Amino acid sequence: MAGMLLCGMVLTAQPGEAGSLPADMSPVEERLAAVRRAPTDPRARLELGLAYLQAEEYDFAMAELVEAIKLNPDNKDNLAAQANYHLGSVLLALDRAALAINAFREALKLGWEDSGVYLSLGQALTSQGKFDEAIIHYREALRLSPGATEAYAGLGLAYEASGRVDEAVTQYERYLQSVPATDDHGVDAIRQRLAKLKERRRM
């Protein structure tokens, strides 16, 4: 539940060169054409994987991201690290958190120091019940990007699940203060959790 609450990250493919391709091509078709022109180019494979990810074609996305990693064993331009991060995102979307954790850790090991990696790793760890470790990664996401408001919600969920009610309340309040006032399902869910925790504290 906690992992699913945070797994609404929007992933976008990097812009590419349209060249002489028809204007009505989908992003997948455009990226597929690029791979046909350069099948051993890891960047083309990465971008095709991202296009498949956007289209929610997860099996195809995984295949292309794995191929991007294989084609770039030296992690030139940090492409293998990026591919591992996005592979982890695909695995997390498929509820394969244990494998996602491995992919996110590999992205970090390869030097992809981005708040999104730490946030996603925190989400995967939370879904596996590894709350103390998740808390470390959510905090790192906030250190790298203080505007990563989802990390406050993640911290709240991890603290709540580990029985640290006061800390959970603080993080939920920070989250709600940081996000725009909307009727978003995630915001409503956090408001409800916060209200229940405050009620529980009064008992």
Model-based region annotation:
Residues P22-M25, A161, E167-M203:
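Terminal, low-structured helical/coil segments at or just beyond the last alpha-helical repeat
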Residues E47, L79-Q82, H86, S120, ...:
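Canonical tetratricopeptide repeat
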Residues P42-R43, K76-D77, A81-Q82, S115-G116, ...:
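Helix-start (N-cap) detector for alpha-helical repeat units in TPR-like alpha-solenoids
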